[in-house]
């Protein structure tokens, strides 16, 4: 917003809640502090979140595909404070307590605190619905996260006062209707397990800007090219995030999975030009998400082949392994 203030042709209106979009008459209706207000538009780029009013208007206009899938899990944020000003765990690590169907994670903050998130089913014996009293909460943490509990002096107060939130994946298509386009969570809300929600929305901005450079003043071409480029990648990062939830809560505690990851890391280290992990492609490159998803699947197949054929001892034999990796790309 600070940058936008330098442009005289940009106006900002606060306390304007979008209520409806009239596509036929190209009008928007807002709820303001002074009552309802209707404005005409020439084009709209809607980034109004996972429960988008603009998307809702598109849903009711017909020929619009939409799905909203909730995980059976919710999440609650907790806190590990510093002790005598010092962090109580390694500040250069993501800490995970995998427990199969649920998990606790902790992320470091600059002030030496850790933001912890408990991902837990709503229902079941070990579900949020059964953790209502102090005794139940204490027993649960003593059973599953006793070492983390020792670092949480405010556990009970935070557990009772902090909300339990939902985890939802939103998919829809088309993102475009006439002079209107959806962007960000409004078009592709995802669960947080790859840490890519904000980044995927920023990628929307980059691609839309590219298409504006190519096709303006033809907004139809801009919007069509934008959604054609972004839709497959939005679906891919949604799938990747769901896959990573299973990996984080369950697979990181499986010895076979960890052995596969050990081989994968070795390949990444020895052959960085030929082998990049899915995580590296998603997090540290501009590789489109759908390509990263496909390459990750190929990587898994390749590592499993190495294990099945007992080729681990050949990983450092450069001629053999470079040839082996090259065959993957044929």
What spans do the regions from the language model cover?
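N-terminal Rossmann-like dinucleotide/flavin-binding domain of flavoprotein oxidoreductases
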Residues: 1-11
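C-terminal helical "tail/cap" subdomain of flavin- and related membrane-associated enzymes
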Residues: 210-330
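Non-transmembrane alpha-helical segments in soluble domains
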Residues: 1, 138-142, 227, 264
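Surface-exposed helix-capping loop/turn segments at secondary-structure junctions
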Residues: 8-10, 149-152, 216-217
């Amino acid at each position: 917003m600070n940058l936008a203030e330098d442009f005289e042709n940009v106006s900002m209106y606060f306390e304007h809640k979008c209520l409806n979009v009239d596509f036929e008459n190209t009008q928007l209706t807002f709820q303001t502090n002074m009552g309802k207000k209707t404005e005409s538009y020439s084009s709209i780029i809607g980034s109004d979140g996972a429960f988008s009013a603009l998307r809702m208007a598109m849903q009711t206009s017909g020929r619009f595909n939409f799905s909203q899938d909730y995980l059976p899990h919710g999440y609650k944020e907790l806190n590990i404070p510093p002790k005598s000003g010092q962090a109580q765990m390694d500040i250069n690590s993501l800490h995970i307590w995998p427990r199969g169907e649920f998990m606790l994670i902790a992320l470091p903050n600059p002030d030496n605190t850790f933001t912890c998130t408990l991902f837990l089913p709503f229902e079941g014996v070990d579900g949020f619905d059964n953790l209502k009293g102090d005794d139940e909460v204490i027993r649960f943490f003593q059973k599953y996260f006793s070492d983390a509990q020792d670092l949480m002096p405010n556990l009970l107060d935070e557990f009772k006062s902090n909300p339990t939130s939902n985890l939802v994946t939103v998919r829809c298509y088309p993102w475009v209707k006439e002079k209107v386009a959806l962007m960000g969570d409004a078009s592709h809300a995802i669960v947080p397990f790859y840490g890519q929600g904000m980044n995927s929305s920023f990628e929307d901005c980059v691609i839309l800007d590219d298409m504006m450079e190519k096709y303006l003043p033809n907004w139809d071409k801009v919007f069509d090219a934008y959604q054609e480029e972004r839709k497959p990648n939005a679906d891919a990062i949604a799938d990747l995030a769901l896959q990573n939830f299973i990996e984080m809560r369950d697979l990181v505690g499986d010895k076979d999975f960890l052995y596969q990851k050990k081989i994968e890391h070795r390949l990444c280290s020895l052959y960085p030009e030929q082998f990049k992990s899915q995580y590296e492609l998603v997090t540290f490159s501009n590789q489109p998400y759908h390509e990263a998803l496909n390459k990750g699947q190929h990587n898994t197949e390749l590592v499993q082949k190495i294990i099945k054929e007992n080729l681990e001892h050949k990983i450092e034999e450069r001629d053999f392994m470079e040839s082996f990796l090259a065959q993957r790309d044929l």
